[in-house]
Amino acid sequence: MTLRDVEKLRLWRLKIFRNQQPILRAKPPHASRKTQYLFQKIDNVKSQFGTDGKGDLLWQRDGMNPYHDLYDPGDLKTHRLSVTKLLTKSWCELRFAYDLYSRLPLFREAHLAAGERTHQKLENSEHTPVIRPQDIPQFSETVEIVEDDLHVLAASWAETITRLIHLFSSGDAREILCHGYLNKETNQLYDPMETEVWDPSQHILISGIIDHLTLTSKNGNLPLNNHHRSIDDSIAKLKNTRNEFAKNGLTIQISDVKTRTRKFIPPQESVQNATKLQLMYYRHFLLSLGTDSDNTYEMLLYNARIRGVDVDQPLNPANCLLIMIQMDGFVGDFVKLQNGDGFQFPKFDNAPISHSFTLADAKHHQFLQNINSHELAGQLLNGTFAKPITLRYFAMRLAQMYSMLTPLISEKLKVEYYHNNECFQEVEFVNDKKSLGESCRSASSFWFGKRAIEPVEATTFNYNQYCKHCDYRDHCAWIKDSLAKSTKLGDELTQIARRIHNI
């Protein structure tokens, strides 16, 4: 008879083996990939937190400051967090801290892959899948695409711009980039509506991706129609009709998609609260990004700079061609850049030009002859550009599009629960600014070492709801000691009750 991997793991967790350090570091033969992952993860955390006399993980770490402990102060690219990283109590904060200090990614379970497929299917149902270079054989054979941070960010911003325009023409947009800034001194989110001055030295970038935006109108009419493909025409019409938005009853609702392995929402209150807070962060970010387009333009440029990107470096010409093929609404804007026309955005129009730029290349002509290119595309392949195509341009257009959203964003937020690609339940709730502020202060205090870890309350109910599903359940001194104390207290109370009964 052979032992299953899980049985081997249980044997190796026995005290007799745990107390033997050479054996502790060894891996049981034929261990599964998940088992090996757990051994490595727990060993990593033990090296950071230490163990008690029983070999279990300690639950506090002296001088803990996750942001400084885990991110390189000399590397600007690491000077940011994600919205999900601020949800420190979505499960148990102790597990969250252990996972951080393990420095390992989450194990890729089957349900995570299934969830990603659902998100991708929903995205593809709303937006035409982006054409990849390998999808056009003559493209990869003719020109070279660059995939560094600059060009990945430019493509992401270009995609977000076109998706926001799509929102005003179709009523839906998915996978929308947003970001905000957290003041590490005050533990508050940056809010341009307040008197606080945005100081990059005090603010940490927080990034997020909104699953779903929905635009509705009382009269059923949307500001744009499918004929508005040009970026310039679309933004011009939105500007001209913005005063009519309120009259037409336009509203934008922010939603998050959660995938489930079964048709029920998570029973843990902390998980439900975290999802709501996630949406509140997104709402705050969209409001902030749309308040002042000039300020948002600067925030976007700073976002790029802390990633180590030069916002004035011209894009690789082949990447510009790819953007035109994927999103032909940009062709007209590129012609304006070539001619040196203004965009009625002084911060961009008056920015100094430090590089020359051209798309003129025999390879590009040859390539465009083999595809159904935009009628204006050929013009772009002749001569130099008065203004190069840079990240500054995309920051300007994205700032303008964000500014269209702010007056329309609803107080009502929504969670969409999916199972097997089907939405089985929607939960709608109202934004709670006070709860968001409290959560942000708590999360910031955790990340910058201003408070101790706050594990889930040690109760039998929580043990069944949280601890039984935790990777650290057999190594957690917090829950073991807490339950032992509660059991001892229960025994003492029972003895007292018996003595009283016998009096």
UniProtKB/Swiss-Prot annotation:
Its main location: mitochondrion. Coiled coil: none annotated. Its cofactor is Mg(2+); [4Fe-4S] cluster. One of its GO terms (molecular function) is 4 iron, 4 sulfur cluster binding. Binds 1 [4Fe-4S] cluster. Monomer. This is Exonuclease V, mitochondrial. It comes from Candida glabrata (strain ATCC 2001 / BCRC 20586 / JCM 3761 / NBRC 0622 / NRRL Y-65 / CBS 138). The lineage of its organism: Eukaryota, Fungi, Dikarya, Ascomycota, Saccharomycotina. The gene is EXO5.
